[in-house]
Structure formats: structure tokens, C-alpha cells
A protein has these predicted regions:
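Active-site bordering "gate/hinge" segments
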Residues: 1-247, 388-391, 397-399
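Short, glycine-/Ser/Thr-/acidic-enriched flexible segments
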Residues: 39, 104-106, 150, 212, ...
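Glycine-rich, charged/polar anion/phosphate-binding loops
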Residues: 130, 192-193, 201-203, 234-237, ...
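A short, compositionally biased
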Residues: 198-203, 262-264, 371-378
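Long, well-ordered mid-to-C-terminal structural blocks that present hydrophobic/aromatic surfaces
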Residues: 242-295
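A structural signal for short secondary-structure junctions
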Residues: 243-244, 259-262, 269-270, 294-298, ...
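Dual-mode signal for accessory low-complexity, basic/Gly-rich regions
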Residues: 275-346
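Extended hydrophobic packing segments that form well-structured cores
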Residues: 354-399
Length: 399
């Protein structure tokens, strides 16, 4: 497991991420929520102390254990399934930051649960996420998250707990003298690539690999973002496209654990922006029901690319945070079905109303599910002026 020294460095990196991810500055008496799984309690304690010393008011929330979560979906009636505790909305309307410490004790405890029930609960809480999304657009809220090693994660990744811990430490630079300085370097290197991408007037992207032939429309008033402090680690650059122009075939060769279910080899075919054919070698019924959660669940909310020169992650980690940042031999691309990111809007985010989002093709959903492809691939940008530029090939941006 991570040492006390590594945990202290991890906390410093998370606080850097929290500050970097928010456009406005934190001030004394701001409210920051620390949400954590039970195995992450020590890191929560360290963060709690550091936030108090900063003059911040920490609000600590422990996630349900696997037994609690299973009981919730097994036993809850329709009203219990959509219940929101008193005070939750008030907290979300006043919160200034959130740090999530992901340390799952089980990845499969919800297998066998009706995916429709999981979706119903997610849809019922979506209004809370809408509140903090708006606060983020206004510059008064920021968030970050990380993952800690657990026996369950290591087992499903096919690693020992020591090997798994070492992978996390390496990916997050926790063995370096100053991990924060390392992240600042990555942040600056990524800024150069984002400037290059955003300097082109891109109309659409063509993604080609052995099993992918997909066209994605960039959309008006968009910008590439990423490596912004939100996720630790994060090496991806991404955009929320205009979902309406998506067409073609996509394949996720990276397995995925979601809501206690295991999914493998997902194949999606898009027509007129929506996934019309859905297949999976494992977990197909679950995938189908997740993508039927609401009207936006079968549409794209994100398109992402990871440069293998940035990421040290070269093994399957059984966790989306790491797997969506896979470097390996050919980097990765992923799409997310479901909700989009309004911070990829190139205009003033404070003026981004629900109506403007809809008109620009920003997808809206209670779902956000990253589906990762690690095949050798080429991504070609089709420019508004008619030209074409290969922007990504063999795992790296062609800058």
C-alpha cells in the first residue's frame, strides 16, 4: 500500500488539482467536500487537516460500502430509489470544491441487479450534478479525484497489491521529489498541444483503426481541454463534440467495470448521432440498458486522445480513471456515451444556457461512460476550409 510519505504527496497533488481545475480562486471559509470509500480514510484524514490549515471548511462524506449499496438496490421500492436526503440540494448550491477518493472494495457486487434500477437512481440525482455543473461554469466550484490501491482492484487487474500500488505511484509521480512540479510540467507540455489543436478550424474527425471507422463532428464554439487538474492522473486531451454528426462504427477493446458489472468488447454503430446497434462480448444486456437510461445515453458526450509520451500507464488497471489514460504502445482514444463537458465551450461559460447547449449539440444525460480503444490508429481532422490534417497517429499527436 502507499506509504505515509506518498499519501502526503498525493494530498498535495490533489490540492494542486483542485486549485487548477477551478477558474476562480479559493478563499477562506469556502466549502470543500471530501467523498471517499472506506479504504481511503487515511488520505481523507490528511486532506482534512491540510484544508483546515488553508482556512477551508471540509465536509466529509463516506460512500456506501458494497453491502450497503447492494442492499439499496435489492430492497428499495420506487420512492426509496429516487430519495434525496434533506440538505443535499442546499450543500450542492453552496459547495466550492469536491475531492473524490476512489478505493473500491468490490467491482462486481451489483452484478445481477436490474440496470434499469441503477439508471433510475442516477437520473433522480442528475439535478444535483446540474447544480454543480452550473457553479463550475460560474467559476465558483472545482473538483478533482484520484484512486487508491485495493486488493479488489489488484485482483481484477491481474496484479499483486504491491504491483498495483507501484503502478499508481509511478503514474502519479509519487516517488518523485516534488510530484506537483512534475504535474506542472505535464500541464505546460499539454498546453502547447491544446493551442495547436484549437488553432485549427476543424469541422470533423475521422478515427480509423482495425475495428474503428468513425466520424465525429467537432461542433461550433468548441475547444480542446484536458490535463487541467480534474483527474489525478490525467494525460488525456478531449473535446465534447456536436453529437448530431456522429456516424460509423466504434469498438472498445479495453474491458470496463461499471456499477458493479463487467463489460468487454463493446461495439457501437452510430447513425445520425445515435447508437443504433449495440453489441458486447460480455455484459451486452447491461450495456443496452445503460444506453437506454435516458434520451442522451446513446449519444456521444466526449471524444478523447491520450499521447503515449505523457502517460506511464501501460497495464489494464480495472478502473476507468487509469484505463482512459492508458499510454502503452499506441496510446488510446475513447468516447464517452452520455453527458458532455460544458467547459469545452470556447465562449463565456457563464452565458452557456441549457438552450444554447442544446442548439450547439452538447449532449445531456445522467450517464457518462468512457469506452476505451487501445488499437493502433490514425485520427484525421477535416478542416472547415476543405483540407485534411493527420493530428494523431501511432499513439502521439503529430505536432
Amino acid at each position: 500500500m502507499l506509504t505515509e510519505k506518498q499519501l502526503d504527496k498525493y494530498a498535495d497533488v490533489l490540492l494542486w488539482g483542485l486549485k487548477t481545475a477551478r477558474t476562480g480562486k479559493y478563499k477562506k471559509n469556502d466549502i470543500v467536500q471530501i467523498r471517499f470509500n472506506l479504504p481511503a480514510v487515511r488520505l481523507a484524514e490528511i486532506l482534512n487537516e491540510k484544508l483546515l490549515k488553508m482556512g477551508i471548511n471540509p465536509v466529509l462524506r463516506m460512500n456506501s460500502t458494497p453491502v450497503m449499496e447492494r442492499s439499496f438496490y435489492d430492497i428499495s421500492d420506487r420512492r426509496q430509489l429516487v430519495f434525496t436526503p434533506p440538505g443535499e440540494e442546499e450543500l450542492y448550491k453552496n459547495i466550492n470544491g469536491s475531492i473524490f477518493l476512489h478505493a473500491p472494495e468490490s467491482l462486481t457486487h451489483l452484478s445481477g441487479i436490474d440496470p434499469g434500477k441503477i439508471g433510475k437512481a442516477a437520473v433522480a440525482r442528475k439535478y444535483l450534478r446540474d447544480i454543480i455543473d452550473k457553479r463550475e461554469e460560474e467559476g465558483v466550484f472545482g473538483w478533482t479525484l484520484c484512486m487508491l490501491p485495493t486488493e479488489e482492484l489488484a485482483k481484477h487487474a491481474g496484479l499483486s497489491i504491491k504491483e498495483y500500488t507501484n503502478e499508481i505511484a509511478a503514474a502519479c509521480f509519487l516517488n518523485k521529489k516534488s510530484p506537483v512540479e512534475e504535474w506542472k510540467r505535464v500541464y505546460n507540455d499539454a498546453a502547447r498541444i491544446k493551442k495547436w489543436l484549437n488553432g485549427m478550424n476543424i469541422k470533423s474527425f475521422l478515427i480509423e483503426s482495425e475495428n474503428i471507422d468513425l466520424e465525429i463532428t467537432s461542433g461550433a464554439q468548441r475547444k480542446w481541454i484536458g490535463i487541467s487538474g480534474h483527474n489525478i492522473p490525467s494525460f488525456e486531451l478531449f473535446i465534447s463534440p456536436d453529437w448530431r454528426g456522429t456516424k460509423g462504427k466504434y469498438f472498445a477493446d479495453q474491458p470496463s467495470y461499471r456499477s458493479g458489472n463487467y463489460v468487454e468488447n463493446v461495439r457501437l454503430e452510430f447513425k445520425k448521432g445515435s447508437a443504433v446497434n449495440i453489441e458486447a462480448e460480455t455484459g451486452e444486456e447491461f450495456v443496452r440498458k445503460q444506453l437506454a437510461m435516458d434520451r442522451g445515453a446513446n449519444k456521444i458526450g466526449e471524444f478523447s486522445l491520450t499521447d503515449r509520451r505523457f502517460s506511464k500507464i501501460n497495464r489494464f488497471m480495472a478502473n476507468t480513471l487509469f484505463d482512459e489514460n492508458y499510454g502503452g504502445s499506441f496510446g488510446n482514444c475513447h468516447i464517452a456515451v452520455g453527458s458532455s463537458y460544458s467547459d469545452t465551450f470556447s465562449g463565456d461559460p457563464k452565458k452557456l444556457t441549457r438552450e444554447i447547449k442544446k442548439n450547439l449539440g452538447f449532449n445531456d444525460s445522467a450517464l457518462h461512460w468512457d469506452l476505451v480503444n487501445t488499437e493502433k490508429k490514425r485520427v484525421t481532422a477535416r478542416l472547415a476550409g476543405g483540407g485534411k490534417v493527420v493530428i494523431y497517429e501511432n499513439g502521439k499527436f503529430m505536432i
